[in-house]
């Protein structure tokens, strides 16, 4: 496994990250982003970092910059049904693979945020703990995945009123749990995540 600084210059490197792994509702999203060195510097200077450390306004402002400067990008998702069928790790890997498959050109190396390799990827890859702050491509992927998933959940909140989805994006807040106990789960809730709450 090569270290970040040992990746050959000129390699087409894709950063991959996911969002929504711990949610009770909706799909898990992933994004893959390929940047060159100039784009990396521009995005770091623009304030790019881990999406969880950015305000919603700052994240939204970075999306057009990422889209403008990246060489290619892809989004993927795996449904609540898939999460229930294969587990959250397997579903997350499906979402990541789908994001990678949407890139205009296959990468030479994939950087995966965290410490778990992408088992479905047969090419060269490297896990990067804390990748959102160490790799601009991973940080950019985290922003795109977060913005795409949040936009979907906002749309779905109109379809499934009463759960407060627009406020918590599907995470297991006290408000969300109270609504689940009162209303029961929707067709897009992850049943495997609700067993302890609903019995």
UniProtKB/Swiss-Prot annotation:
Subcellular location: Cytoplasm
Cofactor binding comment, as recorded: Manganese or magnesium. Binds 1 divalent metal ion per monomer in the absence of substrate. May bind a second metal ion after substrate binding.
Catalytic activity: Endonucleolytic cleavage to 5'-phosphomonoester
Similarity comment text for this entry: Belongs to the RNase HII family.
Organism: Synechococcus sp. (strain CC9902)
Broad class of enzyme this protein falls into: hydrolase
EC number annotated for this UniProt entry: 3.1.26.4
Parts of the chain that traverse the membrane: none
Its job: Endonuclease that specifically degrades the RNA of RNA-DNA hybrids.
Cofactor(s) the protein requires to work: Mn(2+); Mg(2+)
MF GO annotations: manganese ion binding; RNA binding; RNA-DNA hybrid ribonuclease activity
Keywords assigned by UniProt, alphabetized: Cytoplasm, Endonuclease, Hydrolase, Manganese, Metal-binding, Nuclease
Gene name per UniProt: rnhB
Positions bound to a divalent metal cation: 17-18, 113
Signal peptide interval: none
One GO biological process term: mismatch repair
Protein name: Ribonuclease HII
NCBIfam families, per the entry: PRK00015.1-3, PRK13925.1
């Amino acid at each position: 496994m090569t270290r970040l600084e040992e990746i050959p210059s000129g390699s087409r490197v894709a950063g991959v990250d996911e969002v929504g792994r711990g949610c009770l509702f909706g799909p898990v999203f992933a994004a893959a982003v390929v940047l060159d060195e100039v784009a990396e510097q521009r995005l770091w200077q623009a304030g790019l970092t881990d999406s969880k450390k950015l305000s919603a306004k700052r994240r939204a402002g970075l999306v057009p910059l990422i889209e403008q400067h990246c060489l290619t990008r892809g989004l993927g998702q795996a449904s609540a049904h898939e999460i229930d069928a294969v587990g959250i790790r397997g579903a997350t890997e499906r979402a990541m693979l789908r994001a990678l498959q949407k890139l205009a050109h296959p990468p030479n190396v994939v950087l995966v945020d965290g410490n778990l390799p992408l088992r479905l990827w047969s090419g060269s890859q490297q896990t990067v703990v804390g990748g959102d702050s160490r790799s601009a491509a991973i940080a950019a992927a985290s922003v795109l995945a977060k913005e795409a998933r949040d936009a979907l959940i906002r749309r779905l909140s109109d379809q499934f009123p009463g759960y407060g989805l627009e406020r918590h994006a599907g995470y297991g807040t006290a408000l969300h749990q109270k609504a689940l106990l009162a209303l029961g789960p929707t067709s897009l809730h992850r049943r495997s995540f609700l067993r302890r709450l609903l019995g």
